[in-house]
From Swiss-Prot:
Compartments, record wording: Cell membrane
Name this protein carries in UniProt: SPbeta prophage-derived uncharacterized membrane protein YosE
Membrane spanning residue stretches: 20-42, 58-78, 95-115
Residue ranges that the Swiss-Prot or TrEMBL entry lists as coiled coil: none
Principal location listed in the UniProt entry: membrane
Upper lineage: Bacteria, Bacillati, Bacillota, Bacilli, Bacillales
Organism for this UniProt entry: Bacillus subtilis (strain 168)
Record's bilayer topology term: Multi-pass membrane protein
GO cellular component terms, semicolon-separated: plasma membrane
Amino acid sequence: MNKDTKDIWSGFFMGSGSLIVVGLLIFVEALTMSLIVYYGLNHVLNPLLIDTYNIQNVHVTLPHAFVIGVLLNVFVKGVKRSDQEKDENIFKKAGKSLFHSTFALIVLYVSTLFI
């Protein structure tokens, strides 16, 4: 194999590997967001609706929560673009996103303690 062919193949493998990593990070972020949506709607909002309005059978399934999580991940987190975010790599963005999602889950859990 000559040098040009090696460069093409190495670029192909690096590009496809980075696409797989980015796809996995987006999946993990969406899964975390879906767990927050699932927990928040079923364990925080559901008791409030039952106590306040006597509404029964409000239950969000995990696939519905995953779709809501994906939509939140795409529309809410995909909209904001700043100069600071352009300089960060994908791992810093995913870490910040997972940190914010985990913080939201902890806040939801603490709020259920006071219901």
